[in-house]
Amino acid sequence: MPSHRSLAGCAPVRCGLGLFFLAVSATGTLSGQCPDGTPPPCAAAPRVLASAHIPDANSVAVLPFENTRRDTAYDYLSDGLASSIATSLAQVPRLAVRSPSFVRRVSQSAVQDEAALGRRLDVRYIVEGEFQRGGDRVRVAVRLVALPSGTERWGDAYVRPSADLLGVQEDIAREVATRIAGALLPPETRALAARPTHDPAAYDLVLRGNFYLAQRSPAAVRRAIDEYDAAARLDSAYVDPLARVAYADGLIVFYGWDFGLPADSVLARGVAAVDRALRLDSASSDAWMARGLLLTRREPRSYQGVIPALTRAVALDPRNTEAWHQLGTTLQYLGKSAASDSALRRAVALEPDRFITLSNLATSAEMDGRFAEARYWNDSALAVNPTFVSALGARVRLAIARHDTATARAATAALDRDRPATEVPIAMAALAAYDAWRGDTASARARAERAVQVFGDATHVLWLGAPTAMALASAGELDRAMDLLERLQPHGIDMHLFLRLPAFDPLRTNPRFVRLFAETSPPAEPQ
C-alpha cells in the first residue's frame, strides 16, 4: 500500500484535479491545438484575446537561449537568460512582453517557422539567441527579429566575464527596448538599469533555483530551496530568493511533501522569509503572491489575509500570471464565481495555453451549471494537454450531465489505463461515476476499491482523498465515503470546494455531510 510519501511525491502537472490552487510548469506531451487547428482557448469558448490576430505593434517575446556547448550543467541559463531579459523589458510600459513561461511552452512545440511562432505568441517581434559558458567567460549572441517578415532588426554578440551576466542582460534589454519603442524615457532607462542584486554569484544561484523550482517535484524543490538559501546568505538584501523560498514552502505544505519537518514548521519558515522580503521591498509582487499562498495553508478555515495579499500582488504587477491564477482560484474556493472567472480570464489572456487555469474555468462553470461553457473551457485545457487526468475526468462528468454516452465512453477509455499512483484516485472517481451512471454497480465498486487501495491513509493529501471519497459515493458506499471525508484534513475552505461537486449529491442530505459542509463553509467576507 502506498505510503504518504509515495502519494505526495508526484509532479503536480500529472496529479491535478482541476481544482488546483497552484499553477505548474507545463511538462509532458502538449499539443497546444484545438480540434479545429486553432490555439487555445478553443474557438467555441468565450474569447479572451480580442487581438489574437492583430499583435500589438510593440509586442515582443524572448525565446529560451540555446546552449551551444550542450553542457547540461548550464541548461539553467537557457530559461534564465530569457526570463531575466523579458522581466527587464516588462519594466517598459510601452512594450507588450509575453509571459516567459508561455513563450517557453510554445517554443517547445512543433512550430518551427518564425512567422507561425509569432502568430502563436501573438507578437510582432521575437528575441532569440545562444550562449556558451566555460570557465570564467560567457559568450552570448542575440538577435531581434521582426515578424511576420523575419527581418533581423538588430543583432550582436557579447563576450564577457561570467560575473558580468547581469550587465549582458541589461545591455540586451536596453537595445531591444530602443529598437522596438524608440528613444527611452528617463524612467524607462532607470528601470532597465535597476539590478536585483550586485552579487553575481547570488544572481547565478537564483537562476539555478528558478530552474529547479519550475520542475515542481519534491527533489527539485528541495534543490531550489538550497540554491535560494545560498543566494540569500551571499546577499542578505536580495529579495528574490526570499520570496521564492517562501513560495517553495507553500508548495511543500500544499502537496503534502515530506521534507522531514512538520507542516507548521515549514509554514513558519516560509512566513519568516516572506516577511523579511516584504520588509526589504514592499513592492515585490512575487513576495505578496507567496504570502497569499502561505496564508491559505496557515489559515485554512478563514483564508484571512489571502485576498488582500493576492490583490496587492496583481496591482503591483498586472502581468503576473501566476498571481492572477492564484487570485482567481482563491475566489473560486470562496464561492465568488464572477470575480473568480474575471481573474482567471486575466491569467489566460496573459498565457492562453495555461491548462491549469483553463481547467479551473471549466470547474467554475460546471459548479454553476453552465455546462456548455464548462465543456469549452475543458476542451481548451485538453487541447493543450491531452493526457491531463483532471480534464479527462471532467469530460466524463460533463458528458454524463448532458447524457452524451459516446463522449463519456471515449473519455473513460482514455482514463482506463495504467497510471501513476498519484493519478489513480482521480481517474477512478470519474470511472466509478460513469459505471454507476450505466447501472454497473459492481464495476463502480471495483473502481472505488482501487482508489481506496492506492490512497491508503494519506489523510493530509486532500486533493487525492476527496476523489477517493467521490468514487465511494458513486459506488453507493456512502458511509465509507463519509468516514473518509471526516478523516481528511484540514476541514477548511479547500475541502468545501470539493464538497460542492455533483459527485457528492448522494450525500447531500446525510446529517454528517450537512455538518461537514457547514463546518467547512468559507466566511461570507474573508479579511
Where are these regions (language model features)?
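TPR/TPR-like alpha-solenoid helical repeat scaffolds
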Residues: A246-A248, V396-I400, A427-A429, A433, ...
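Bacterial N-terminal signal peptides
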Residues: R14-T29
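Sterile Alpha Motif
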Residues: V461-Q489
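Alpha-helical adaptor scaffolds
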Residues: A290-R297, E322, T329-Q332, T363, ...
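C-terminal non-catalytic interaction modules
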Residues: D483-Q527
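N-terminal secretory signal peptides that target proteins for export/translocation
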Residues: M1-P12
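Acidic, proline/glycine-rich low-complexity intrinsically disordered segments
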Residues: G32-L398, D404-P420, S443, P502
